[in-house]
Amino acid sequence: MDVRFDSYIYGKEIVMERSLSAGFQVNIGDVTMDFVTEAEVFSPQGADRGTLAMLSVVKLEESDKLLDLGCGYGLVGIWAAKQIGAEQVTMCDIAETAVKVARENCERNGVDVAVLKSDGLKDLPEVLRFTKILSNPPYHEDFSVPKGFIELGYKRLELGGVMYMVTKRRDWYYNKLKTVFGGVRVEEIDGYYVFTAEKRERKPVEKKKNEQIMSKKLQRKMSKKKKAHHSNT
Protein backbone atom coordinates (compact mmCIF):
# COMPACT_ATOMS: atom_id res chain seq x y z
CA MET A 1 0.00 0.00 0.00
CA ASP A 2 1.25 3.50 -0.83
CA VAL A 3 1.91 5.62 2.23
CA ARG A 4 2.90 8.87 0.52
CA PHE A 5 2.49 10.53 -2.85
CA ASP A 6 4.30 13.75 -3.70
CA SER A 7 4.38 15.80 -6.88
CA TYR A 8 6.54 18.82 -7.67
CA ILE A 9 7.71 20.71 -10.73
CA TYR A 10 11.34 21.56 -11.51
CA GLY A 11 11.68 23.61 -14.67
CA LYS A 12 9.65 21.74 -17.27
CA GLU A 13 9.87 18.37 -15.53
CA ILE A 14 7.10 16.98 -13.36
CA VAL A 15 8.54 14.86 -10.57
CA MET A 16 6.30 12.34 -8.85
CA GLU A 17 7.31 10.22 -5.91
CA ARG A 18 5.44 7.61 -3.94
CA SER A 19 6.43 5.45 -1.02
CA LEU A 20 5.91 1.72 -1.39
CA SER A 21 5.94 -1.02 1.20
CA ALA A 22 9.45 -1.98 0.06
CA GLY A 23 11.10 1.24 -1.12
CA PHE A 24 9.82 4.07 -3.29
CA GLN A 25 9.22 5.03 -6.90
CA VAL A 26 10.36 8.24 -8.60
CA ASN A 27 9.10 9.57 -11.93
CA ILE A 28 11.11 12.37 -13.54
CA GLY A 29 9.41 13.37 -16.76
CA ASP A 30 8.96 10.09 -18.62
CA VAL A 31 11.68 8.26 -16.64
CA THR A 32 10.29 5.88 -14.00
CA MET A 33 12.58 4.33 -11.38
CA ASP A 34 12.07 2.01 -8.40
CA PHE A 35 14.41 2.16 -5.41
CA VAL A 36 15.21 0.49 -2.13
CA THR A 37 17.67 1.99 0.33
CA GLU A 38 18.96 1.76 3.88
CA ALA A 39 18.90 4.22 6.77
CA GLU A 40 22.58 5.16 6.56
CA VAL A 41 22.50 5.87 2.80
CA PHE A 42 21.63 9.40 1.63
CA SER A 43 18.72 10.11 1.31
CA PRO A 44 16.78 7.30 3.06
CA GLN A 45 13.30 8.85 2.91
CA GLY A 46 13.16 9.26 -0.86
CA ALA A 47 14.44 11.52 -3.62
CA ASP A 48 16.46 14.44 -2.25
CA ARG A 49 15.08 17.82 -3.31
CA GLY A 50 18.55 19.17 -3.96
CA THR A 51 19.37 16.30 -6.31
CA LEU A 52 16.10 16.86 -8.16
CA ALA A 53 16.92 20.56 -8.45
CA MET A 54 20.28 19.67 -10.03
CA LEU A 55 18.75 17.20 -12.47
CA SER A 56 16.31 19.88 -13.64
CA VAL A 57 19.17 21.83 -15.25
CA VAL A 58 21.32 18.94 -16.52
CA LYS A 59 21.47 18.58 -20.29
CA LEU A 60 22.41 15.11 -21.50
CA GLU A 61 23.70 14.03 -24.91
CA GLU A 62 23.83 10.49 -26.29
CA SER A 63 27.62 10.67 -26.51
CA ASP A 64 28.06 11.69 -22.86
CA LYS A 65 30.30 9.77 -20.47
CA LEU A 66 28.78 10.54 -17.10
CA LEU A 67 29.99 10.08 -13.53
CA ASP A 68 27.55 10.00 -10.61
CA LEU A 69 30.03 11.11 -7.93
CA GLY A 70 28.92 10.06 -4.44
CA CYS A 71 26.05 8.06 -5.88
CA GLY A 72 24.25 7.04 -2.68
CA TYR A 73 21.47 4.62 -3.63
CA GLY A 74 21.87 5.51 -7.32
CA LEU A 75 19.15 7.97 -8.37
CA VAL A 76 21.36 10.17 -10.58
CA GLY A 77 23.24 7.38 -12.32
CA ILE A 78 20.16 5.29 -13.00
CA TRP A 79 18.25 8.34 -14.27
CA ALA A 80 21.12 9.06 -16.68
CA ALA A 81 21.52 5.41 -17.74
CA LYS A 82 17.87 5.20 -18.76
CA GLN A 83 18.46 8.09 -21.16
CA ILE A 84 21.97 7.69 -22.59
CA GLY A 85 22.65 4.01 -21.92
CA ALA A 86 24.20 2.16 -18.99
CA GLU A 87 27.56 1.75 -20.75
CA GLN A 88 27.92 5.55 -20.77
CA VAL A 89 27.53 5.89 -16.99
CA THR A 90 29.79 5.24 -13.99
CA MET A 91 28.66 5.49 -10.37
CA CYS A 92 30.88 5.63 -7.30
CA ASP A 93 30.66 6.04 -3.54
CA ILE A 94 33.04 5.66 -0.62
CA ALA A 95 30.51 3.69 1.47
CA GLU A 96 30.20 -0.08 1.00
CA THR A 97 26.50 0.04 1.89
CA ALA A 98 25.80 2.69 -0.74
CA VAL A 99 27.63 0.68 -3.40
CA LYS A 100 25.67 -2.46 -2.48
CA VAL A 101 22.31 -0.67 -2.55
CA ALA A 102 23.13 1.18 -5.79
CA ARG A 103 24.00 -2.11 -7.50
CA GLU A 104 20.74 -3.62 -6.29
CA ASN A 105 18.82 -0.62 -7.62
CA CYS A 106 20.56 -0.87 -10.99
CA GLU A 107 19.36 -4.46 -11.22
CA ARG A 108 15.82 -3.46 -10.17
CA ASN A 109 15.74 -0.85 -12.92
CA GLY A 110 17.28 -3.00 -15.65
CA VAL A 111 20.47 -0.98 -16.17
CA ASP A 112 23.91 -2.59 -16.01
CA VAL A 113 25.90 0.38 -14.72
CA ALA A 114 29.42 0.08 -13.31
CA VAL A 115 29.14 0.93 -9.59
CA LEU A 116 32.57 1.34 -8.00
CA LYS A 117 33.77 1.85 -4.44
CA SER A 118 35.99 4.92 -4.43
CA ASP A 119 37.06 7.71 -2.12
CA GLY A 120 35.80 10.49 -4.35
CA LEU A 121 37.62 10.04 -7.66
CA LYS A 122 40.87 8.82 -6.08
CA ASP A 123 40.31 5.09 -6.60
CA LEU A 124 38.70 5.20 -10.04
CA PRO A 125 40.65 3.58 -12.90
CA GLU A 126 43.03 6.17 -14.35
CA VAL A 127 41.75 5.57 -17.89
CA LEU A 128 38.25 6.84 -17.08
CA ARG A 129 37.42 10.29 -18.45
CA PHE A 130 34.04 12.01 -18.42
CA THR A 131 32.04 14.66 -20.22
CA LYS A 132 29.63 15.15 -17.30
CA ILE A 133 30.21 14.85 -13.55
CA LEU A 134 27.19 15.21 -11.26
CA SER A 135 27.46 15.48 -7.50
CA ASN A 136 25.48 16.37 -4.40
CA PRO A 137 28.47 16.44 -2.03
CA PRO A 138 28.22 15.74 1.71
CA TYR A 139 27.78 18.80 3.91
CA HIS A 140 30.55 19.26 6.46
CA GLU A 141 32.20 22.21 8.15
CA ASP A 142 35.40 20.84 6.62
CA PHE A 143 35.44 21.40 2.84
CA SER A 144 38.14 18.81 2.12
CA VAL A 145 35.68 16.41 0.46
CA PRO A 146 34.15 18.85 -2.06
CA LYS A 147 37.62 20.34 -2.61
CA GLY A 148 38.82 16.93 -3.76
CA PHE A 149 35.69 16.40 -5.85
CA ILE A 150 36.24 19.69 -7.70
CA GLU A 151 40.01 19.48 -8.20
CA LEU A 152 40.13 15.82 -9.24
CA GLY A 153 36.87 16.18 -11.15
CA TYR A 154 38.46 18.88 -13.28
CA LYS A 155 41.34 16.56 -14.15
CA ARG A 156 39.00 13.72 -15.13
CA LEU A 157 36.76 15.87 -17.32
CA GLU A 158 37.40 15.99 -21.04
CA LEU A 159 37.89 19.42 -22.58
CA GLY A 160 34.41 20.94 -22.85
CA GLY A 161 33.12 18.66 -20.10
CA VAL A 162 30.80 19.99 -17.42
CA MET A 163 30.61 19.56 -13.65
CA TYR A 164 27.23 19.97 -11.95
CA MET A 165 27.02 20.35 -8.17
CA VAL A 166 24.16 21.14 -5.80
CA THR A 167 24.53 22.40 -2.24
CA LYS A 168 22.83 24.45 0.45
CA ARG A 169 25.83 26.78 0.59
CA ARG A 170 26.85 29.23 -2.07
CA ASP A 171 30.01 31.22 -1.42
CA TRP A 172 32.68 28.56 -0.86
CA TYR A 173 31.50 26.43 -3.80
CA TYR A 174 31.17 29.43 -6.09
CA ASN A 175 34.66 30.66 -5.26
CA LYS A 176 36.28 27.22 -5.53
CA LEU A 177 34.63 26.30 -8.84
CA LYS A 178 35.43 29.71 -10.30
CA THR A 179 39.05 29.42 -9.18
CA VAL A 180 39.52 25.97 -10.72
CA PHE A 181 37.32 26.25 -13.82
CA GLY A 182 37.67 29.97 -14.51
CA GLY A 183 33.92 30.52 -14.41
CA VAL A 184 30.71 29.05 -12.99
CA ARG A 185 26.96 29.56 -13.36
CA VAL A 186 24.77 29.48 -10.25
CA GLU A 187 21.01 28.97 -10.12
CA GLU A 188 18.92 29.02 -6.95
CA ILE A 189 16.20 26.35 -7.13
CA ASP A 190 13.92 25.30 -4.28
CA GLY A 191 16.32 26.63 -1.65
CA TYR A 192 19.39 24.96 -3.19
CA TYR A 193 22.27 26.32 -5.24
CA VAL A 194 22.96 24.48 -8.48
CA PHE A 195 26.42 25.09 -9.96
CA THR A 196 27.42 24.47 -13.58
CA ALA A 197 31.11 24.74 -14.53
CA GLU A 198 32.67 23.91 -17.90
CA LYS A 199 36.26 22.81 -18.45
CA ARG A 200 37.66 25.22 -21.04
CA GLU A 201 41.39 24.75 -20.41
CA ARG A 202 43.48 21.62 -20.08
CA LYS A 203 45.03 22.87 -16.84
CA PRO A 204 43.10 24.31 -13.89
CA VAL A 205 43.02 28.10 -13.97
CA GLU A 206 44.60 28.36 -10.51
CA LYS A 207 47.47 26.10 -11.59
CA LYS A 208 48.09 28.16 -14.72
CA LYS A 209 48.19 31.34 -12.63
CA ASN A 210 50.65 29.75 -10.21
CA GLU A 211 52.85 28.67 -13.12
CA GLN A 212 52.74 32.20 -14.53
CA ILE A 213 53.74 33.62 -11.14
CA MET A 214 56.58 31.12 -10.83
CA SER A 215 57.65 31.88 -14.39
CA LYS A 216 57.85 35.60 -13.60
CA LYS A 217 59.82 34.88 -10.44
CA LEU A 218 62.20 32.70 -12.43
CA GLN A 219 62.60 35.43 -15.05
CA ARG A 220 63.46 37.98 -12.36
CA LYS A 221 65.91 35.55 -10.78
CA MET A 222 67.63 34.91 -14.12
CA SER A 223 67.73 38.64 -14.79
CA LYS A 224 69.45 39.26 -11.44
CA LYS A 225 71.99 36.53 -12.20
CA LYS A 226 72.78 38.10 -15.57
CA LYS A 227 73.24 41.52 -13.98
CA ALA A 228 75.49 40.05 -11.30
CA HIS A 229 77.52 38.25 -13.96
CA HIS A 230 77.97 41.42 -16.03
CA SER A 231 79.01 43.44 -12.97
CA ASN A 232 81.73 40.91 -12.18
CA THR A 233 83.21 40.97 -15.68
Model-derived regions: residue spans:
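SAM-dependent Rossmann-like transferase core, predominantly class I methyltransferases
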Residues: 13-61
